[in-house]
Amino acid sequence: MVLRVKKQTKVENPRGYIAKVVDELRNLLTAGARARRDPSRENFYEVENAKNVFYIHISPVTGNVVLLAKWPGQSQGAREKAKNATA
């Protein structure tokens, strides 16, 4: 699925990530980001780009995005190796 938000959407940062990380997420979501819905939590998603995975919540009331966690993503090469190892 692809998630896209308006440029003026507020990105909340309760964990205090540096501004560069918040800007990276905002730019990713504004452009349209590949995302996976958390099957056990409504309105929670993993959003990723080439470098990072972001765990976010999108408020159904305000539309605000809450950045809850960030971790390094897998490179395309690592994904291919994992895919081939399980095939």
Short names for language-model regions:
Residues 52-53, 57-87:
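Enriched for short, Lys/Arg-rich terminal
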Residues 23-49:
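A short, surface-exposed loop/turn module that caps and links secondary-structure elements
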Residues 1-20:
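Arg/Lys-rich, positively charged N-terminal/basic patches that mediate binding to nucleic acids
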Residues 13-16, 45, 66:
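Amphipathic alpha-helical recognition patches that constitute DNA-binding helices
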